């Protein structure tokens, strides 16, 4: 049986500066066009953009068979 060599430690991720995500304008024409196709009404629009309200019904997770 051949002898096992030493396993060196691999190069880990460098802990440099993280790149910040650019601030996205949710009112830009491209965002509005996207919202036009995915939202069905104003409440849905606000929900998709992250503006939830306290009494909102919870969505069903997964699909039922």
UniProtKB/Swiss-Prot annotation:
Region span, Disordered: 1-24
Protein name per the record: Small lysine-rich protein 1
Transmembrane segments: none
Originating gene: SMKR1
Source lineage: Eukaryota, Metazoa, Chordata, Craniata, Vertebrata
Highest taxon in the source lineage: Eukaryota
Basic residues bias: start-end ranges: 1-20
